[in-house]
Amino acid sequence: MSLLKNKRRISLRQLKYGNSETRVAVTILFFVICSWNAPAQENIRFRVACWNTENLFDTHHDSLKNDYEFLPNAMRHWNYNRYKKKLSDIARVITAIGEWNAPALIGLCEVENDTVLRDLTHRSPLQELDYRYVMTDSPDLRGIDVALLYQRDLFKLLSSRSISIPMFRQHRPTRDLLHVNGLLLTGDTLDVFVCHLPSRSGGAKESEPYRLHAAQILRTEVDSVLHTRLHPQVIIMGDFNDYPNNKSIRKILEAEAPPIRSDSLDIATHPATSPSSLSPLKLYHLLARKAKTANFGSYKYHGEWGLLDHLIVSGTLLNTSGNFFTHEEKAKVCQLPFLLTDDKKYGGKEPFRTYKGMKYQGGFSDHLPIYTDFELVLP
């Protein structure tokens, strides 16, 4: 019996004072046991999308708006069945973009009024996702506006406002900018700008001053947020009717491709950049680098793909040590097969539009959606 007790004492002594291998094993076991009881961090995917829906009009005339071509008796024969199909199609796309979870935020361009947003969120298949929305009420002559759909469990709305674009050189009135801010689950404030800048009607060069004018107003509003928020988190999205290398984005917003991370997939072809090169007051274009590759874009014009739709973020949102961040590798153009059709004139594929000219196609839009994933880190 004494021999057994002595052996037990030796075993305990070996655990306490034994060799290094024993001590390491005990240490590992201790931390494994502790980790069972320690609360684990929870990471939530927070998907943000943007889409120009191409003329989402109802079938009724809005007073003082030039929406006559989208009435049942007009040349386009825009009737209730076509309108209802368009709503269902948009709901289908938004659901598909979200995959297994609904996108947290969706910026929409070319939506006519509150009626179409209410029908989309409450009278289409999208009603199952319980979206809420805010939108502008612009002086645009055609009556098209921008909107933001949001999931209330991920984004608590604090405020929203329309930012008007004063007339410039007697140009016709254009769409307001939409500024929305809300609280994330982390308690941080997120500022979102949804934009649809003046079109290229009349020529890209001739119409450029109007886009520069709108971009300058956007820049001023964004700068105000960047310099007043203690921890500015800004997302800018929408149809700029300009490409990443145009002046509105390159010179006015000064949005450029993010620095390359040392763990980036592009490290083989791009030099690594120190994370310290990120500036919280600077704007970064999540799709700028990809836009330089062939056949990449959200819009096809005369057989050439290009990026008219943009996702731009402040530097804080690229800091992976934070609790809400993204990276350019997460940003994509949504190329679901049913959104595309054969380009019979130039070859390849093109967006499957609702109308091609005046002919009804029954498709979705002349633009493809874009999106990115943020990581929301909860304690």
Show which residues each predicted segment covers.
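Active-site His/acidic residue clusters
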Residues: 64-67, 193-207
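Structured beta-strand-rich core segments of catalytic domains in phosphoester-bond hydrolases
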Residues: 53, 111-198
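Metal-dependent phosphoester-hydrolase catalytic domains
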Residues: 224-234, 242-379
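N-terminal, active-site-proximal structural segment of metallo-dependent hydrolase catalytic domains
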Residues: 36-130, 134-146, 343-348, 362, ...
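Extracytoplasmic/secreted cell-surface and envelope-processing proteins
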Residues: 58-59, 115-118, 142-143, 201-204, ...
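Active-site beta-strand/loop signature of hydrolases that rely on acidic residues for catalysis
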Residues: 48-53, 78, 83-86, 90-117, ...
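Second-shell loop/turn segments in exported
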Residues: 74-81, 102-108, 135-136, 166-168, ...
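Bacterial Sec-dependent N-terminal signal peptides
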Residues: 1-43
